[in-house]
């Protein structure tokens, strides 16, 4: 959602921007780092300057970054393994499990990850 909200050229930009603007969103710390990485590595002309990507994250999410302790993340791997979560879905599971642990709603346009989010007990709002 954050990449789409920050990127006027993105197909889900309007829905993502509106979803963020309608609330006081938080962001999973890992997802913030992924967002910064994605925004600053896009091919030109869509690539953001690092300072611009940081400003976006600061403006939209301020001090509302959430995350799990290292010990909690370590324990998650057992849950992921038992649930059959592996590969790239592991990162979706981390985001979902973090929002679930915080009692937050995960706002996403990523239909691909919905099963993974359900497996870790995330409350999900699908946008777009």
Across the structure, where does each feature detected by a protein language model lie?
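PIN/NYN-family metal-dependent endoribonuclease catalytic core
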Residues: 17-45, 60, 64-70
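Generic alpha-helical structural context detector
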Residues: 1-4, 37-40, 58, 78
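Histidine- and aromatic-rich ligand-binding microenvironments
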Residues: 27-29, 88-89, 110, 125-128
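Alpha-helix/helix-capping structural signal
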Residues: 1, 111-112
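Active-site neighborhoods of divalent-metal-dependent phosphate/nucleic-acid chemistry enzymes
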Residues: 63-111
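Short, well-structured N-terminal submotif of metal-dependent ribonuclease cores
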Residues: 1-28, 43-52, 120
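Short loop/helix-cap segments at secondary-structure boundaries that form the rim of catalytic
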Residues: 114-120
């Amino acid at each position: 959602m954050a990449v789409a909200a920050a990127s006027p050229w993105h197909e889900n930009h309007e829905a993502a921007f509106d979803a963020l603007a309608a609330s006081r969103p938080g962001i999973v710390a890992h997802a913030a780092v992924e967002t910064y990485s994605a925004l600053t590595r896009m091919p030109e002309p869509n690539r953001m300057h690092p300072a611009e990507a940081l400003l976006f994250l600061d403006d939209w999410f301020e001090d509302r970054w959430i995350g799990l302790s290292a010990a909690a993340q370590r324990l998650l791997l057992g849950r992921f393994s038992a649930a059959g979560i592996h590969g790239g879905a592991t990162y979706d599971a981390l985001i979902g499990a973090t929002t679930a642990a915080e009692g937050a709603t995960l706002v996403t346009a990523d239909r691909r990850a919905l099963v993974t989010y359900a497996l870790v007990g995330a409350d999900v709002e699908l946008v777009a």
